[in-house]
Amino acid sequence: MALHDENVVWHSHPVTPQQREQHHGHRGVVLWFTGLSGSGKSTVAGALEEALHKLGVSTYLLDGDNVRHGLCSDLGFSDADRKENIRRVGEVANLMVEAGLVVLTAFISPHRAERQMVRERVGEGRFIEVFVDTPLAICEARDPKGLYKKARAGELRNFTGIDSVYEAPESAEIHLNGEQLVTNLVQQLLDLLRQNDIIRS
């Protein structure tokens, strides 16, 4: 479909995002977890989702590996495909925000421009960049998927942090120390959500 096909007309919903938020009892936002492989993004995002669920918050977690089994199964790891991967996830996250959900995404998303692209799509005030800052040496020691070992052996090319750049956020809404206990990081995130009147429980 052409980007501006004149036969494709935007359909306005009778139920507004604000009405959906009122129904859920909280605001719809995206928490965009970014960091190196092994930094703890998925672990912290999963623990936060569990905590929010217990508080009665409507959530959904989009994980970098999971979406490549379906939504982005046709994409590889070239720069163009990686950008398209993030674009698609951003669109899905935006739809979920409009549905009034608290959306958690766990993606390396190494480039600032791509994260900014999603921020602009979702809109200021609804996009929370979460930088899980864990030293490369710690990430490599953890190596939960064995990817650093493969990258060091030359079996995996263009691996972020080894032979492909990671552009750390310059002004993330929250900067987490990935060496801290997960429970501490989850509490910091819950505090942020409450301080910004996103959740009330």
From Swiss-Prot:
Active site: 109 (phosphoserine intermediate)
Pathway per the UniProt entry: Sulfur metabolism; hydrogen sulfide biosynthesis; sulfite from sulfate: step 2/3
A GO BP entry: hydrogen sulfide biosynthetic process
EC number(s) stated in the UniProt entry for this protein: 2.7.1.25
Record flagged with keyword ATP-binding: yes
GO MF annotation: an example: ATP binding
Class in the EC hierarchy, top level: transferase
Keywords: ATP-binding, Kinase, Nucleotide-binding, Phosphoprotein, Transferase
Pfam family, one: APS_kinase
Annotated catalysed reactions: adenosine 5'-phosphosulfate + ATP = 3'-phosphoadenylyl sulfate + ADP + H(+)
Positions in coiled-coil regions: none
InterPro entries cross-referenced by the UniProt entry: APS_kinase, P-loop_NTPase
Residues annotated to bind ATP: 35-42
Ranges where the record places region Disordered: 1-23
Keyword Mitochondrion found: no
NCBIfam families, per database record: apsK, PRK03846.1
Role this protein plays: Catalyzes the synthesis of activated sulfate.
Entry's family note: Belongs to the APS kinase family.
Protein name listed in UniProt: Adenylyl-sulfate kinase
Gene: cysC
